[in-house]
A protein has these predicted regions:
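Conserved, mostly hydrophobic/aromatic
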Residues: 49-52, 80, 137
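Active-site glycine- and acidic-residue-rich loops that bind
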Residues: 2-9, 55-70
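Catalytic-face loop-and-helix region of soluble metabolic enzyme cores
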Residues: 81-132
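Active-site beta->alpha loop and helix N-cap motifs at the rims of alpha/beta catalytic domains
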Residues: 1-40, 53, 111-115, 133-135, ...
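C-terminal helical cap(s) of enzyme catalytic domains, especially alpha/beta-barrels
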Residues: 68-73, 145-159
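Short, acidic/polar
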Residues: 37-48, 119-129
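Acidic (Asp/Glu)-rich catalytic clusters
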Residues: 15-21, 47-50, 71-74, 128-132
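Active-site-proximal loop/turn and secondary-structure-junction residues that shape catalytic pockets
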Residues: 1, 29-33, 61-64, 82-88, ...
Length: 159
């Protein structure tokens, strides 16, 4: 429909067109904030988008305390973002993409492993720690789809 073409500067404007009304919509969640937005802007975006959304997908983080707090306070069901199996080198690279705070927390939590950059890491510990409060996980396949799929099958995480 050509009537909805326009200059959109945020996803909320796209959602408000009604074009996606027949789809389930997930919105971004930032348990540790964002390097690109202030906390108040993140809260404003969450409050504005929540009435149109069905669930929240969080950014990848290793901070289970921040995730637990976020899940408890979220206005919608939360799909917690975790990194699938990947080398430490790959995880450190992606941690940098989601913000300095995440990178520092990740490095602190994994300081003993930081020199073994080729070892494959999995999110099993994060999943086990959150499993009693979280029903849904979103797996970021930073280490590749094949490796992630094999891990999901091995751990029997498929439903």
């Amino acid at each position: 429909d050509r009537d909805i073409l326009g200059d959109y500067h945020c996803s909320l404007q796209l959602i408000e067109t009604g074009l996606f009304d027949s789809f389930k919509i997930g919105i971004a969640g930032h348990p540790e904030g964002s390097p690109n937005m202030s906390d108040s802007l993140i809260d404003e975006a969450m409050n504005s988008k929540s009435p149109f959304a069905d669930y929240i997908v969080t950014q990848w983080t290793q901070d289970t305390t921040a995730l637990s707090k976020f899940v408890a306070e979220a206005p919608l069901p939360v799909h917690v973002g975790v990194a699938g199996p990947a080398s430490m080198k790959t995880l450190v690279k992606f941690a940098g993409f989601v913000g300095l705070k995440n990178t520092l927390n990740f490095a602190k939590k994994n300081a003993s492993k930081i020199f073994d950059l080729l070892t494959v890491q999995t999110p099993n510990d994060v999943i086990q720690e959150l499993r009693s409060n979280v029903d849904n996980f979103h797996i970021y396949a930073f280490g590749g789809i094949k490796k992630t799929n094999e891990w999901l099958e091995k751990e029997n995480y498929y439903v």
